[in-house]
Amino acid sequence: MNMKFYRKLPIPQEVKAEYPVTPEMAAVKEARDREIRSIFTGESNRFILVIGPCSADKSESVLEYIGRLKRVADQVQDKIIVIPRIYTNKPRTTGDGYKGMLHQPDPNGHPDMLRGIVAIRQLHMSALRDYGMSSADEMLYPDNHRYLSDLLSYVAVGARSVENQQHRLTASGLDIPVGLKNPTGGDLSVMMNAVTAAHHPHTFIYRGWEVESTGNPLAHAILRGYQTTDGKTVSNYHYEDLLHLHELYAKSGLENPAVIVDTNHANSGKKYEEQIRIAHDVLHSMRQNPDIRRLCKGLMIESYLIDGNQKTDGDVYGQSITDPCLGWEKTERLIFEIADRL
């Protein structure tokens, strides 16, 4: 094999024992999990915002962002439940570039997976312990989920991973909502097949064990736009897109039909300020059609402290080093606008 086996990493149980969740933290997560579940099952008509930096690059600035987010979340909690987006793994189209805190706890340092495992657990723990906010992360590596399984309230499977069988089967064994994105080519049947697979029970290999999952009734779709073969970005958040997805769900017979609309990525063409208009467009569609209102459970928004983005070695505190994000002032205003229009 063309790889060096550098060192054996601790298993999730060992990391959890060294960095434990307190009973108080567990109770907060359990309560938030119940609230979020009630939205996906239709028992609650509150709205979900999965919101935060494109990538969680530095703990200090991410936690400052979450502190600000918590203050706003408390003011809109009658209409919105806010889930901070703390994405610590980054899929890369060609494999190059910053791969996230798991790989590089120091964005300008060398990869260090052991330090990375500890760093991402401590970051998610801080969000829960210090701000009472259980968080969302992307499940880029299914085998790594258990390092964070007692901290996360939401998981996303990305556009490049949604066709992968291990992602689908692992999603079927989680007890929290898992959003499965449409693939980069835009074929919604691929996404719906992934959602269907995640809803069903399976027997498979996970972390060296033969396991049986019970199926995840909270697995759902995420619309993020797509690219044509010639590289053109195409959005899929419009009224007719949401209505089409409603029809696909009706044909599928799946329990708890749901979608989260990703306002960035190909939906915005990575023009981060377009996220504001897209959010309002989705809310307008929801007001126009009760089926869309029931289907659309929330939005995914990329935002940070400072507008835009910078290179990985940039020194602007709280500005994204991956995709451009909304800055804090625009974010705060948008959250209040969303609450006013629900």
Describe these PLM feature segments:
Residues 66, 79-244, 265-270, 274-281, ...:
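Active-site-facing alpha/beta catalytic cores
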Residues 52, 261, 327:
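Conserved, mostly hydrophobic/aromatic
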Residues 28-46, 61-74, 82:
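Generic N-terminal targeting/processing segments that precede catalytic cores or assembly contacts
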Residues 1-43:
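N- or domain-start disorder-to-order transition segments that initiate the globular core
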Residues 304-342:
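Internal helix-turn-beta structural module
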Residues 40-43, 70-77, 125-130, 213, ...:
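Acidic (Asp/Glu)-rich catalytic clusters
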Residues 54-57, 256, 264-270:
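Short acidic, Gly/Ser-rich segments with clustered Asp/Glu that frequently serve as metal-coordination loops
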Residues 48-61, 323:
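Conserved phosphate/anionic-ligand binding catalytic regions in large, soluble enzymes, centered on
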